[in-house]
């Protein structure tokens, strides 16, 4: 591989086992990190606001829960796993006052460091450990003696051993069993945002909705359009997930593959590629981050409007009716109430 990859033999759990880790947040990643750290012999405290609904769950799982400020004061290593938009205030109010020399500040995503929303003091280590999978998978793989690949990055190495500490943390949550890839805060943040906006979320959702619209506007039944443009997408993505695009093409019919090869580049053409480059440029320049922070601080008016418009799209009502016919699909509470 062209990147540096670390495994179990490259990481020393001893670098973290003698120190206290505060996990700030107890959502998808927070619970997986905390429980796996504990099971790896690391002293863990959880930082949650007094009124957090996650406090009872963490306590039931045998973890000691403090306020974020109390956890930051007690810990040697502080892992922030709160949402991006909550991190700056959380850091300023609860963590910064207790971030004394020699401590380490860790992140699961580089957004706030990359865009200067958080500026740690120069006498602390700053690193990132980012599992490339949801928290439930991170935890399940750890319990099964396996692991989820992680990204690791060091932004600030005050101690001279920040990378070693980050690798020890990754090992404690199972990452080095699978492999830990070295990156930077900038690379992780920019590629993560681009993937979300241009491909995984924004690109895929827009492609599916537009395909549905083209078929229904041409007079085809919404139910059939839903199957062809959304439902069957999972079959294709699963094949890609298992073996890449080549595996998908090997597995589909020759008719489907010919249509893929001959028509796909007409849909996603050079103009689309240029617009994708423009999206990347907004990420690299900080334009997107500034826009999103301002939107959040203004109460998210555009976000709320766009979310409501998406929920009202005809594909949602059609999909709800069709999913009711599929006993194998776990339907959300909003569709089963």
Swiss-Prot record:
Binding site for substrate: 253
Catalytic reaction equation(s): (2R)-2,3-dihydroxy-3-methylbutanoate + NADP(+) = (2S)-2-acetolactate + NADPH + H(+); (2R,3R)-2,3-dihydroxy-3-methylpentanoate + NADP(+) = (S)-2-ethyl-2-hydroxy-3-oxobutanoate + NADPH + H(+)
Pfam families attached to this UniProt entry: KARI_C (PF01450), KARI_N (PF07991)
Record-annotated active site: 109
EC annotation from Swiss-Prot or TrEMBL: 1.1.1.86
Function of the molecule: Involved in the biosynthesis of branched-chain amino acids (BCAA). Catalyzes an alkyl-migration followed by a ketol-acid reduction of (S)-2-acetolactate (S2AL) to yield (R)-2,3-dihydroxy-isovalerate. In the isomerase reaction, S2AL is rearranged via a Mg-dependent methyl migration to produce 3-hydroxy-3-methyl-2-ketobutyrate (HMKB). In the reductase reaction, this 2-ketoacid undergoes a metal-dependent reduction by NADPH to yield (R)-2,3-dihydroxy-isovalerate.
Name assigned to this protein: Ketol-acid reductoisomerase (NADP(+))
Organism this protein belongs to: Salinispora tropica (strain ATCC BAA-916 / DSM 44818 / JCM 13857 / NBRC 105044 / CNB-440)
């Amino acid at each position: 591989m062209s990147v540096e990859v670390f495994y179990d033999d490259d990481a020393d759990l001893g670098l973290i086992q003698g120190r206290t880790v505060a996990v700030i947040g107890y959502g998808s990643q927070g619970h997986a990190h905390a429980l796996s750290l504990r099971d790896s012999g690391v002293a863990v405290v959880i930082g949650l606001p007094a009124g957090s609904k996650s406090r009872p769950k963490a306590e039931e799982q045998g973890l000691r829960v403090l306020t974020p400020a109390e956890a930051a004061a007690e810990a040697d290593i502080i892992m922030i796993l709160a949402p991006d938009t909550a991190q700056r205030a959380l850091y300023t109010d609860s963590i910064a006052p207790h971030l004394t020399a020699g401590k380490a500040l860790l992140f699961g995503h580089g957004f706030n460091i990359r865009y200067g929303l958080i500026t740690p003091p120069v006498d602390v280590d700053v690193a990132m450990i980012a599992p490339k999978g949801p928290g439930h998978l991170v935890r399940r793989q750890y319990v099964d003696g396996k692991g989820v690949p992680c990204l690791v990055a060091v932004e600030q190495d005050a101690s001279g051993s920040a990378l070693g500490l980050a690798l020890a943390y990754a090992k404690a949550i199972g990452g080095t069993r699978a492999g830990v890839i070295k990156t930077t805060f900038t690379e992780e943040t920019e590629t993560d945002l681009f993937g979300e906006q241009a491909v995984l979320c924004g690109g895929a959702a827009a492609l599916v909705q537009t395909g549905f619209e083209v078929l229904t506007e041409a007079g085809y039944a919404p139910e059939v359009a839903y199957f062809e443009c959304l439902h069957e997408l999972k079959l294709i993505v699963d094949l890609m997930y298992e073996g890449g695009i080549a595996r998908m093409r090997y597995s589909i019919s020759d008719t489907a593959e010919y249509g893929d090869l001959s028509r796909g580049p007409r849909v996603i053409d050079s103009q689309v590629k240029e617009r994708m480059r423009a999206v990347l440029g907004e990420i690299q320049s900080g334009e997107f981050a500034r826009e999103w922070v301002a939107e959040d601080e203004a109460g998210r008016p555009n976000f709320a409007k766009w979310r409501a418009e998406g929920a009202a799209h005809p594909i949602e009502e059609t999909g709800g009716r069709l999913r009711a016919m599929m006993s194998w699909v776990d339907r959300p509470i909003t569709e089963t109430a």
